[in-house]
Amino acid sequence: MEKTFNLTRRDDGIAILTMDVPGETMNTLKAQFGPEISEILADIKSDSSIRGLVLISGKKDSFVAGADISMLDACKTAGDAKALSQQGHVVFNELEALTIPVVAAIHGACLGGGLELALACHQRVCSDDGKTMLGVPEVQLGLLPGGGGTQRLPRLVGITTALDMMLTGKQIRPKQALKMGLVNDVVPQTILLQTAVEMALAGKRAPKPVKKSLVNQVLEGTSFGRNIIFDQATKQVEKKTQGNYPAPAKIIDCVRQGITKGMQKGLEVEASHFAELVVSKESEALRSIFFATTEMKKETGAEGASPRKVKKAVILGGGLMGGGIASVTTTKAKIPVRVKDISEKGLSNALAYAYKLLDKGVKRRHMTPAARDNLMALMTTTTEYKGVKDADIVVEAVFEDLALKHQMVKDIERECGEHTIFASNTSSLPISQIAEAATRPENVIGLHYFSPVEKMPLVEVIAHAKTSPETIATTVAFARKQGKTPIVVQDGAGFYVNRILALYMNEAAQLLLEGQSVEHLDKALVKFGFPVGPITLLDEVGIDVGAKISPILEKELGERFKAPAAFDKLLGDDRKGRKNGKGFYQYGASSKKAKAVDESVYGVLGIKPGTNKDAKALAERCVVQMLNEAVRCLDDGIIASPRDGDIGAIFGIGFPPFLGGPFHYIDTLGAANLVRILEGYQSQLGSRFEPCERLKTMAQENAHFF
């Protein structure tokens, strides 16, 4: 069996320990490595000729990307998970206890268990390469750093900085890592090993004291001050998580116990808390999303089809969506883009949009002004069809007007090559209708982005009956290069995300008309786990947009999509939401930092907000509509699998990740229980709550999706 760790001795007395997991592109830590590392460390201890040790990766662009997550699924009990954490503690403690200097030479991803390994070394040096990132992202999987990270990190960089890293899972760039004291030096990759060897030869050195702000010095220097930090962090966590995620509170407790009662106690608490989190339903759900998205990245979207290379893209429309799509195409995908708009104003808007986003990177020192300018040079503009002939893909982001989109299809078929893909960013029009104007319908596809484009991770790739597999595969690959998570859905009104969202939003609007207050409704759904409430979302998306989509869905899918009368009343009062500063909430100079409801909206709707119902009951009534419709979408073949439905809902509308997505959540609730809830509402409120056939069958058979 090939070994992962290879020890070589140099003439100057420095030993190089190279980690290279056989057959994998990245290094990850596995349980079976424990005995192998312990054996090597015993060998080093017994060899008096070794004066220092350098730990380095044999992989091209990865130090250690973290622990192998699949190990956790093998843990049947909390005891198994605790043993895993304790094994890590033993190995890392042995490494730290070596009397010779130990230096970690870091290039590429140094995350999770990888950073914990580096923290157990006496010094760290990293490359200045853009691929080098350091962090502890375990919280994003509902976990905490279980290899001593909650103890070593605060002792190295300070409590406040360590908590910020662990509670957000943020990744740190080399310069920032040096500034915060996470690494001792940053050098070009070409001299990384040489520098690490020189550091080992120079011997152990006490870490330089981290430069802390005066406030942090005062707070972290006394037990009273430290308690303020922990209490403040706890309050912020409770506000952000609404009590739905157990990991952040446990991270704070690990640090608190370790600082007040010593490292040994801290490690004991870390192992116990880690074990509890591994077997928690929240972490299980978050890990399922991680595995699903990882699995999805290996798929082309169309079985047996390979994507064509996209060397140039054209965006039609320089508005908010067009500007955002052009921006992610140049900055993330590094693909040259030609933006076409009928007006110079639209073009200057698109350029300004892209520049503003890139300039943020310069201001945050993530990129140089020269790098920003090079990326901006990839974007060119035109008011006519010039410089578009060689486009591999054209993304249309114009007004939702079928005749206009038909004209665009004809223009592109005339001006571009026979293989050029025409991808429409429509949010409501069926792609088959847009393709009716095409002589090459196999090249027509939907590519539905969500606003704001640079922040929302999901795109829906919509295939109509005649879309070719190669067009699907190429569009999926293009979206991935833009940093997006694409799901392939079949053509149909509302596609998947807007279809399940519409019923949820309609139900919230119905509750509003029944006298529930705006803020109570929003708070109820935020407490349930959504990032924003449905009424806030309606203001952000645009009340006019919601009103436009509803009739299309009702016409194609039936009366259950009939929108409450609220939309017409609001539009009659020229309330479109944030975009025109007039919606459910106050905007503009008069609005305070904490959003206030525009109380006059109740008069427009002809209602008086009355007694607020139980928040759980409100959330349930909105959410069960979404769950029922998600299953209908699966039945109708709109989505290919429950997995795709979960990813679409989480990344497209912020369905609570800790629930794992609509289909995972239905499994948790039980189909029979969901059918009972839906039938209860059906008897009170009408046929829009009727459970779909598949749910009824699953309830009878006690079946699950996963």
Curated annotation (Swiss-Prot):
Marked site positions, Important for catalytic activity: 116, 138
Region annotation (Enoyl-CoA hydratase) ranges: 1-188
UniProt-listed Enzyme Commission number(s): 4.2.1.17, 5.1.2.3, 1.1.1.35
Catalysed reaction equations from the record: a (3S)-3-hydroxyacyl-CoA = a (2E)-enoyl-CoA + H2O; a 4-saturated-(3S)-3-hydroxyacyl-CoA = a (3E)-enoyl-CoA + H2O; a (3S)-3-hydroxyacyl-CoA + NAD(+) = a 3-oxoacyl-CoA + NADH + H(+); (3S)-3-hydroxybutanoyl-CoA = (3R)-3-hydroxybutanoyl-CoA
Pathway in which this enzyme or protein is active: Lipid metabolism; fatty acid beta-oxidation
Classification via Gene3D superfamilies: 1.10.1040.50, 2-enoyl-CoA Hydratase, Chain A, domain 1, NAD(P)-binding Rossmann-like Domain
The UniProt record lists the keyword tRNA processing: no
Predominant location: cytoplasm
Protein name from the UniProt record: Fatty acid oxidation complex subunit alpha
The keyword Thylakoid is assigned to this record: no
Compartment(s) of residence: Cytoplasm
Keyword terms: Cytoplasm, Fatty acid metabolism, Isomerase, Lipid degradation, Lipid metabolism, Lyase, Multifunctional enzyme, NAD, Oxidoreductase
Role: Catalyzes the formation of a hydroxyacyl-CoA by addition of water on enoyl-CoA. Also exhibits 3-hydroxyacyl-CoA epimerase and 3-hydroxyacyl-CoA dehydrogenase activities.
Residue segments, region 3-hydroxyacyl-CoA dehydrogenase: 308-706
Gene Ontology terms: cellular component: cytoplasm
Biological processes, Gene Ontology terms: fatty acid beta-oxidation
Domain of life of the organism encoding this protein: Bacteria
Assembly and interaction partners: Heterotetramer of two alpha chains (FadJ) and two beta chains (FadI).
GO molecular function: 3-hydroxybutyryl-CoA epimerase activity; enoyl-CoA hydratase activity; long-chain-3-hydroxyacyl-CoA dehydrogenase activity; NAD+ binding
Family per similarity comment: In the N-terminal section; belongs to the enoyl-CoA hydratase/isomerase family.
